[in-house]
Amino acid sequence: MKKGLLILLCLPIIGFGQNVNIPDSNFKTYLVGEPLINTNGDTEIQISEANTFNGTIWCENMNITDLTGIEYFINLTSLYCPNNQIATLNTSQNISLTWLSCYDNQLTSLNLNGAIALEGLYAWNNQLANLDVSQNTSLISLVCNNNQLTSLNLSQISCALQINESDFSENPNLNCIEVTDLSCWQNHIGLIDTTYQYYSTNCNTTAIEEHTTNKKLLKVTDLLGRETKGTKNE
């Protein structure tokens, strides 16, 4: 009898533990209001609902400050969260994430280590001092201008990387981009802006072999990497 009573008392605790912790009320309101995410139509997001969702979360300009809970969306393919007040973002559990747009926030920390499928990162107009993309070997588009970057190491990126767009401009403290074992000339770079930076095989030495890059715009692409009509610069 006592054993059966103990099991019954534990059931509410077990049930509560199945809900995703989403402390930001604006983010939670968005998720609960999405029928493809909140499939049972209640007022919570269950872990099972988050785990099985394999679409896009689009929460632009919603006054969100915290994306805690995103880690349960392990099959999430795209995350668009620009124009918010997000300071930290951890996508290390989002192993299926291919596109991340987090520009126009207040990001000081961006963890991409587990997002091994990431192809496009758009993180301009933030406060990032460091950016580690060493595990994101599928990147084809990297735009992180207007941050506070002091270093950017692309050394672990495969030489087969098909980068077609990159912009590191307006990072006043970023002088060198380390590219050991990366040859930009073996890629298909269509747009690259390194107005205030140079490439080097060793950013820590005073005797630096500088590499220049042809900044001519070969094609104009949209945020999804698709070629669009535009004027090429000369």
Task: Label each region the model flagged.
Residues 71, 83, 93-95, 104, ...:
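Extracellular, beta-strand-rich repeat scaffolds characterized by small/acidic residue-biased motifs
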Residues 200-227:
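Residue-level detector of functionally pivotal "anchor" positions at catalytic/ligand-binding pockets or at interdomain
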Residues 4-78, 95, 116, 154-159, ...:
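N-terminal capping/linker segments that flank leucine-rich repeat
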Residues 55-59, 79-81, 98-102, 119-123, ...:
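Conserved hydrophobic beta-strand positions in leucine-rich repeat
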Residues 226, 231-234:
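Short, intrinsically disordered, charge-balanced linker/junction segments flanking boundaries
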